[in-house]
Swiss-Prot record:
Entry protein name: Large ribosomal subunit protein uL23
Function text: One of the early assembly proteins it binds 23S rRNA. One of the proteins that surrounds the polypeptide exit tunnel on the outside of the ribosome. Forms the main docking site for trigger factor binding to the ribosome.
Family statement: Belongs to the universal ribosomal protein uL23 family.
Gene source species: Akkermansia muciniphila (strain ATCC BAA-835 / DSM 22959 / JCM 33894 / BCRC 81048 / CCUG 64013 / CIP 107961 / Muc)
One GO-annotated biological process of the protein: translation
Keyword line: Ribonucleoprotein, Ribosomal protein, RNA-binding, rRNA-binding
Entries under InterPro entries matching the protein: Nucleotide-bd_a/b_plait_sf, Ribosomal_uL23-like, Ribosomal_uL23/eL15/eS24_sf, Ribosomal_uL23_CS
Pfam families named among the record's database cross-references: Ribosomal_L23 (PF00276)
Top-level taxon of the source organism: Bacteria
Classification lineage: Bacteria, Pseudomonadati, Verrucomicrobiota, Verrucomicrobiia, Verrucomicrobiales
Amino acid sequence: MKDIYQVIKKVRISEKATMLQETTGELVFEVDRDANKIEIKKAVEVAFGKKVASVRTANYDGKLKRQRRSDAGRTAHWKKAYVKLANGETLDLV
């Protein structure tokens, strides 16, 4: 298993993530692309000391970006994890 600080890269804070946290108690993280659901669950439980009920993941391709006229590039691909805490567990990240 990877180090927990290599699995969880950062917390994703957006309007959608804030609404999810307020309504369903789900947290949204940007995680390592190679991390699986079991590693994400263990990393959140160890880092924050909370019990995790479920983890959903989504892979995102990097966007195409242009610099100057013809130099085309791409931003990095990344992975998002939606983590639902167990009943009675709360965590305020916002």
